[in-house]
Amino acid sequence: KEILELYSNDFFRIDPSGMFLTLYNSIPSQLAKNNKFYITKVTNKKVTNKDRKFIFDLLNSKTILPFYKVNDPSLSLNETKDIDNFKLYLSDIGLFTTMLFNDKLSTNENIYIKLLSDKLDVNLGYLYENAIAQIIKSNDRDLFYYVFKNDETTRSYEIYFLTTDSNKLVPIEVKSSETKNHKSINEFSRKYSSKISRRILFFQDDIFHDEMLELRPIYLAPLTIKNFKW
């Protein structure tokens, strides 16, 4: 909490209006609603050039992780990213956890004990997403996601994380439970089968394989991602 207070003081020095801090503090709630980060949801008005400057300055502060939508993963992740469609994660998972419960009077060690023992009665999918995002970025990789429609239906699918291994695509999903549901990866793999190196689902269970899909416990994410080749 003391670190967050220092951040707040710094943000106010940069922007006395408080918008800088408002944007930063809104990230956990936006992710909790499974939203992309829409600045209009925070400011409640049409985006201005000044608002865009706030986002740019926030990105430069290195306190957040930008996460861009890719338009065509079959070509290039970086070259086909849409700079107007992005999510934001926090660059520090510890601060993210504290911010999630910052409005509770009992933000203390008990919350972290329950978190580590998987006894916290909340959906923590977005917390694990932020952790994976931080791991990917710590390996000097940019963050991308992909949304696409089934060729035969109007249903949309989303690949939470899209990166590469040996110049081929690696779709990654993360689940906060032991569920093995992976419809999005299945559809993506069918559509881009020749472009894929591996497909991975991080979840709360032991190592498991479902045909070509690698299911791995979340604690193996740092080692798994570190071993990706450029």
Which positions does each model-derived feature cover?
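Arginine/glycine-rich "motif VI" loop of SF2 helicases in the C-terminal RecA-like domain
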Residues: F188-I196
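Short, hydrophobic beta-strand segments that form beta-sheet elements in well-ordered domains
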Residues: S197-F203
